[in-house]
Amino acid sequence: MIRLLGLTTRRVAVRTPVTALYSTGKPIDPKHIFTDPQTNRIRDPPNYFQKGRGRGTEDAPLPADMHYGMGAQEAVSEAIGASIRQQRARKRRGILLALVVAVFGTVFGYSIGYRVFYKHSESFLPLWPAKRSRPLSEKDAANLRVAEVKRMAEFRVFERLSMHKMIKEQFGVPLHTQDGKKPETNVFVLWCEDQDPCITGLLFRPSGSHAPDHGHTWHDFLGLVQWRVTHRPVSIRNAAERVLNFIGLGTSDLFQMVDPSKVYGDFKYEFPLPKRNDNDHAMHICFLGEMPLGPDSLVVYRGKYHVGVRLDQVDLFRREDGKLIRYVLYKNS
């Protein structure tokens, strides 16, 4: 009797690769979501034991504690989203880096490579706006007779105070302090202010240049280029003049400006320095003085100096009833 061999089948619970990976608690690396073999495992083709040919040979279901597709799909979606965001961030950083390199390469290539190395001339690289007011340098202060400026300023102050009604009534004419002495200035400060806005930057020139430095300190870099920190004026009128000259015109062809205050040089109260180059600019010499008239009275004045003294404002500060009161005695309008 021929016995037929009976083939028995059994159900096998098969976990998907992503479900098996998340059941272990290991996070999916978003960089390799599409290349990791654990999340992209190639499934075997259907065989006799996977694809039923008779009764009882259906695909094996998942365990009762697993919900196929829910947690795994959400995790895969989050990993894909994180990968896309990282790719976009890397792309933005690459574009920004390329833009910065292009800008710096163009600026330094023109300023140093072309102007300094090829043309053998000075090149100015602007950095940030400069303060318009700054203290006098030792050289500029030595050229000014500070005692003479102070004496002229005091004379102008006495002139203005002697014409004020309140000062004449309380301190008399000629002017004297409460103890009968002649007022004297105990604080006198000089500084300079640029007429035009200025920009602080780096000035480059070729190493070994024999151009006069006028006492400036230069720093050498690798024996190729020298640099120092300086500032340059920004004049809209001069810029317009250069543009018109480039096209063959001039400001005199279009209009003529007449300023009554322009008497000496470019400006009536400019600092009288010898013109060294085209980058020199006019500066105002300003002063501030304090002249006490008594224990509770103080005169504060300020103005400008060139070959003469011009007062801008004279104030009187007094302490009355425990309060500090300010009286504007003179103001140049």
Curated annotation (Swiss-Prot):
Protein name as catalogued: Altered inheritance of mitochondria protein 39, mitochondrial
Keywords attached to this entry: Membrane, Mitochondrion, Transit peptide, Transmembrane, Transmembrane helix
Main location as per UniProt: mitochondrion
Membrane-spanning parts: 94-114
Bilayer topology annotation: Single-pass membrane protein
Extent of the transit peptide: 1-86
Region (Disordered): 32-56
Cellular component GO terms, alphabetical: mitochondrial membrane
Compartments where found: Mitochondrion membrane
Origin superkingdom: Eukaryota
The keyword Protease is annotated on this UniProt entry: no
Upper classification of the organism: Eukaryota, Fungi, Dikarya, Ascomycota, Saccharomycotina
Family: Belongs to the AIM39 family.
